[in-house]
Amino acid sequence: WASYLSQDDSIIRDIPILCGMVSRNAVLLPDSNINVAEWTPESVNVEDLKNKRRNLAGFVYNYDIKANIELVRKLYPSTKHFALITDNSYGGISLQALVKKEIGKIKGIDFIPLDGRKNDIYNIIEEIKQLPPQSIILLGTWRVDVNDGYYVGNATYTMMLANPKVPA
C-alpha cells in the first residue's frame, strides 16, 4: 500500500487499486536511503491522493485524533502531556505523523513521542516511568522495536504497569 501511494503519478495513474481496511492517513516513502529513526514524514490523507486522479477505492479507517483528545480532556481535565507509543513499522510511523499533525492544531498540549524507531521496549518502559504528572498515554501500535524485536500483546500490559498512575 505504502509503495503504491509513493509511486510517481505517471507510473500508476491508470491502474485501479482496491484497498481493504487501511488507514485514511499515510506517509509517502522517501526516494533515498535515509535514517528512518530521524525521518519526520508528513501525514497525507488518502482522499487527497484520490483527488489527484489516483484510481483508488475500498474501505479505510479514519482515526479521529481531535475527538480522542477531547475525550481524554473530558475524562481527565487536568491532562497537559500526551504521550504516544508507536513502533518501528510503517503503521507506527504513519500514526505518529498523523497524531503530530493533529495535536499541533490544538493549543495547550505537550506531545511526547515514545518512538519504537529509537527505543526498545525497555527504554520505552523507562520513559513511561519518567512521564510528568498530568500525563496520559495514547497507545498506537507496538509490534516491532528499534532492534527489530517482535512483540505480542502482553508487551502493552508491561508498558501500562510501568507507571500505573498514568491513564492508558
Residue ranges of each PLM-predicted region?
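Short hydrophobic alpha-helices and adjacent helix-cap/hinge residues
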Residues: W1-A168
